[in-house]
């Protein structure tokens, strides 16, 4: 059998659709997955969370995989009798809804909430064990009110601020993007080439937490995927070195540069500033102004990725000024060059071409001097064009001559400190989180701009600042927020002086919404605070978080930052939000990501109609380790259907042939051993998140039970009933519909997924014998049944005593005997 046909599977084993409808109705009525807040409830608490979906349409294959995996984990803890919080909500602000509203002339809420209801119905059909009483939507005023409340608390603490600066601008979506939302120079949402613009924007000061974000990763080691931790470490980008002050001729204040190689300071032969920085504009001499302006215009068309590419020919312009090297007094030219970025370090660098390839490429292009100050034993970079950044002995460096790098760095920092021209410093690649957006469908920033009072927070009692009713063409991007055109909404009285003022017309990055939603689930209907701190202390932090690796830097980093701020505010008792993280792979098709352009998309609804929910879920989880991609062209939902029918028949026949309550100890011992070993192995595999291995063990038990029914003690044997019950319990993690039906057929009430897990009998886990393979010249000649505790000496003796083995070694010289007790003996002969 390969598919669901009409109302029944083609084998006629059970009516898949009727069974799904029956149990959906039962779960909706009984709500078996609602978490208890009863303080007297003795059950251990467990918080399992899937990254909440964006309502862009119905659920797709990626949702199906992620939520199937998360549901296995949640159902396992439900089955173990724990008090599990497994909630659902929607990340419902964002550009897709706004773009749809512009295209079809309606309000974004119409599209958003219609899609939410579609997805909610699909979640119910897909049998996810959710606590529906805690459902939330981030686009509800009752939710985004607290985004605004947090913004004001951040503002009070100096963590929310506004500044002028160069920002990433998406010309298609007409809004700014955080650095994390620019992927290889393009908008991560629409793929448009990103531009750089000078704008006044709101930021969250995540850089204040850079070191703590790094240090606290120790809590996550071994519990988060190492690649996610590596990605975050690289994004934060801690560098140790020195801040060095260069005097600029004609400028009173020195310019500070950060370098990780202060030991090479004697090799600095020119000075480079970012062409789009205010410093470059200031330093440009009048006679170079025209050339500089032309160059700056040229650079403005390049993305940061292009500017830092090692493949591009270096470009730049001399600014007509000179800097003074603080260690040797040398006069070095000041250039503007696109490979230096305004927002890294101080927007300026000392160029040491002998030991940095980008500096060397630039020096060779513009005939600037190259001075070797570290003897690495390699050829002169000025001749080869290959810089030598490695270790060596300092030369041409005055008091540093003869020192190694590790000796020279602290010495030069000491010299700079004594002279007042430098100091040890730490720099981070991480930049503050740009949180303002020039779009409508998001949380309004709760600030009022008063010509007399400046930036004035909206009073807490006036929150939420609700979005005005704009729709269709009024939402079209114009380079400023659509809210700016809502004059009745914009024009207000200043809360401080009462004079005329204007609301801030930007909305918040929707990653603000998802940076704390997991806390709101603990008390989703609370209207006096963002969350009940006592309940958060009981439920948090989240024990298991499940979602895609694409969120490694954005959502996960921001959530970690938010949690640390809330910890400092005394609102949560933990500093990390997610104890364990599982990143599932992608569902691809024919070796490629699914896309309309490739025509390789797979419709989840059609797959469910064809095979049934249980088969689709089982296939998703059985395809391989959860972190690996699933190629839907390579898996077989039809095979899952066949297996589920075999499991169903075992449960049905055991239920029909035997009565509950009979002591299974009176049943077939071999099957009982298999049943309890399966329990132990499934438990171990699920806890290790090797879900495909757990399913394989269940399949083996179904086969053993089938064999016992057909050619063993028969379906009436108590051991068969015990096996059938364990099949129902363990299969309930992966295929809840057929498992619930089997559990009920076997005479049980209540959900198979709640409090039913069994502990294996240790006595039945002890193997009385194992099979030992005996090889002669690497060919199998006999198989022996031996004790699992047999010694190597005894096993060798038994192997040599075997008549079959004797027939193959008679008259031959035995070179050596390899024993791997208790399962292998290999006799090597001449």
Curated annotation (Swiss-Prot):
GO terms for biological process: leucyl-tRNA aminoacylation. Its main location: cytoplasm. Its EC number is 6.1.1.4. Signal peptide: none annotated. GO terms for molecular function: aminoacyl-tRNA deacylase activity; ATP binding; leucine-tRNA ligase activity. A motif ('KMSKS' region) lies at residues 593-597. A motif ('HIGH' region) lies at residues 53-63. The gene is leuS. It catalyses: tRNA(Leu) + L-leucine + ATP = L-leucyl-tRNA(Leu) + AMP + diphosphate. One of its GO terms (cellular component) is cytosol. It is an enzyme of class 6 (ligase). Residues 379-399 are annotated as: Disordered. InterPro entries: aa-tRNA-synth_I_CS (IPR001412), aa-tRNA-synth_Ia (IPR002300), Leu-tRNA-ligase (IPR002302), Leu_tRNA-synth_edit (IPR025709), M/V/L/I-tRNA-synth_anticd-bd (IPR013155), Methionyl/Leucyl_tRNA_Synth (IPR015413), Rossmann-like_a/b/a_fold (IPR014729), tRNAsynth_Ia_anticodon-bd (IPR009080). ATP binds at residue 596. This is Leucine--tRNA ligase. The keyword Ligase applies. It comes from Thermobifida fusca (strain YX).
